[in-house]
Amino acid sequence: IEQSFNVPIFQIPEGYESSFDYLKHLTECALLNRYDNNVPSIATERLSYELDVVKEKGCADFFLHYFEFVSWAKENGILVSPGRASSAGWLINWLLGITEPNPIDYHLLSERFYNKDSARIPDIDIEVENGAQKRLIEHLEDRFGKDNVSRIISFGYYGAETSIKNASRALGLPIEDMVKLTKHIPEKILVSEDGLNQLPLKVTIKNCLKYDVDFKQFYNRCRGQKKQTIDVASELEGKTGVIGLHRSAILITDDTSKYSFPKMKIYDESLTDRLTCVASQYDRHNSEIYGAVLIDVVEDPDLSQIKQCIALIKEHHGLNIDISKIPLDDIETLNMFRNGEIEGIPQFDSQEMKTWLTALKPDCFEDITALYALSRPGMTDLVSEFIRRKHNSNTAYEDEVTRAILSDTYGMIIYQEQIMSILQDIARFSPEETDHVRRLFGKKAKGELAEQHLKFIDRGIEQGYARVIIENIWEAMELKGTKVFCRAYAVSRCLT
């Protein structure tokens, strides 16, 4: 049964029965072309799986719209990034030219992006050079009509500090007292559930009063207007304070759309002349609930710099550079990273990264990708272990399956996709089950993870593994599961 989304119908060429039929034709032809008519079975099976998902979810039109959109951008000289987030893991995206890395080559997984259990329409972000978003919106208006293209409204909500400032103004609290109140709001709130691990909580006034000892004591010392200000602020907190535009989401509809979206005119604060534009009154969350097609266009200044470099090379050296064809094993480039010569390189231009690179001495693209992933918030404490393992050839693996999955990160679990692959290859979890477990690790859902733990042990033993090995593997996943990063995101960013 096809899931119905609010997707405008894609106008397919004559000779095809449906948008799915056309998508199937495009991707199968592209697969033959990409592999020069020598397609490996893993690619054939991967495409078959993804097409089954598309057919069941009823979203062929969605991918065709993105195919047309990205193709038009590239044909009109707009620099588009290799990909963003998990969309690089979808083989269909690569075959249609929406993303650039071959997901099979980089061990990326389809189900990390989209699978049969996904509740909503896929999410693809397109990164482009500065100034290109307006051109792309105009292209969409040409295709669908101005009445069917709009921006998405966004709501800013009062946080703890803003609530206190607004309550202070309303109650006439002196500025110096207001400043004192805001200074007592902690930067973070950590709560321990088991007496060992501290988990961060959102910094709200209510959480401060409940969990932060210093703020609670300060509140109890307050009297009169100060205490009233905190009380009012706690009620004001979380209320809508600012209405603006979502920076990337563009809503498209047509006469075939099942739902209409209420719209309004709003100032686009990103434009110097403050022009008004049409925006849906549903925010992103509610638009997605109704199955809206949102095309995300993010302007990236790094792409503008890259395009300028390409133009300068052509001007001064007469060379036409295609950055998608630059070899990733170029010795001179790798030596620059090894020596910490990374000034001006997106994602890597920092003193901390320079120190790590000179210690790591990367000799392949995978090393650079892994270090980028480990540089993300919450993972930097693993960098030293990764560097040590890189230079120690005695890494031990539980078995050959985990060796195949973890060898390019020297036995460390760094990526979400590695956990998902372990679940599939060792315990025969389905693609949908692996994505579910991945989400549970991210949410630290102990109760549900305990159920999955038992399932992993039982299925692993059924596959012939000793219980001690299965337990060790689960323990390693549980230890790193809350910190791991999306590999598709890391690969895409490092290719930019």
Residue ranges and their predicted role:
Residues I1-T496:
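Alpha-helical scaffold/interaction cores of sigma-54-like transcription cofactors
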